[in-house]
Amino acid sequence: ISAEAPLYAEVGMPALSPTMT
């Protein structure tokens, strides 16, 4: 999910984005 983390962050799910948190 680390690779998809920034994608989730843009979608509106910063909780699933450890790298963007």
Curated annotation (Swiss-Prot):
Q: How does it assemble?
A: Forms a 60-polypeptide structural core.
This protein's UniProt keywords: Acyltransferase, Lipoyl, Mitochondrion, Transferase
Q: Any S-S bridges, and between which cysteines?
A: none
**Job of this protein:** The pyruvate dehydrogenase complex catalyzes the overall conversion of pyruvate to acetyl-CoA and CO(2). It contains multiple copies of three enzymatic components: pyruvate dehydrogenase (E1), dihydrolipoamide acetyltransferase (E2) and lipoamide dehydrogenase (E3).
Localized where?
Mitochondrion matrix
GO terms for CC?
A: mitochondrial matrix
The species this protein belongs to is: Solanum tuberosum (Potato)
Q: Which EC class, in a word?
A: transferase
Could you say which cofactors this protein requires? (R)-lipoate
Membrane spanning residue stretches: none
- Catalytic activity, EC: 2.3.1.12
The chemistry this enzyme catalyses reads: N(6)-[(R)-dihydrolipoyl]-L-lysyl-[protein] + acetyl-CoA = N(6)-[(R)-S(8)-acetyldihydrolipoyl]-L-lysyl-[protein] + CoA
What is this protein's record name? Answer: 78 kDa dihydrolipoyllysine-residue acetyltransferase component of pyruvate dehydrogenase complex
Q: How is the cofactor bound?
A: Binds 2 lipoyl cofactors covalently.
Q: Give GO terms: molecular function aspect only.
A: dihydrolipoyllysine-residue acetyltransferase activity
Q: Which family does the entry's similarity section mention?
A: Belongs to the 2-oxoacid dehydrogenase family.
Q: Chief localization class? A: mitochondrion
